[in-house]
């Protein structure tokens, strides 16, 4: 059975979806440093991270079973993309996953400013 490791509080639906597709899934709430990450990746083929976990060349070298890294955030700058690509590790992210939420916030801010709510807020 393929193993997946999801870090940094990735939504439980992601873990369940992976289980539904035959993965053995381990989840952890926080980010891991390089040494801890290498230890945790023993036998893992899929790593799911957010922006605080760095996937360096050293991590990639130490984890031959790793085949994919999912960045559950906007960017992929926390992963050594060139090195991952040279080692056949696919890296993906969800760049527009929060677009609707951002639009809703901006519209709400516009309405608040039009109604002068910040000017009428007392601390």
Residue ranges and their predicted role:
Residues 26, 33, 45-123:
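Phosphate/diphosphate ligand-binding glycine-rich loop within oxidoreductases
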């Amino acid at each position: 059975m393929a193993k997946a490791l999801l870090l940094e509080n990735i939504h439980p639906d992601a873990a369940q979806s992976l289980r539904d597709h035959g993965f053995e899934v381990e989840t952890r709430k926080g980010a891991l440093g390089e040494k801890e990450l290498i230890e945790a990746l023993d036998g893992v083929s899929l790593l799911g991270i957010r922006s605080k976990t760095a996937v360096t060349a050293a991590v990639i070298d130490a984890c031959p079973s790793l085949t994919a890294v999912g960045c559950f955030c906007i960017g992929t700058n926390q992963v050594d993309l060139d090195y991952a690509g040279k080692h056949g590790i696919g890296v993906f992210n969800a760049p527009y996953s929060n677009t609707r939420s951002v639009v809703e916030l901006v519209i709400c801010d516009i309405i608040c400013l039009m109604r002068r709510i910040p000017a009428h807020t007392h601390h």
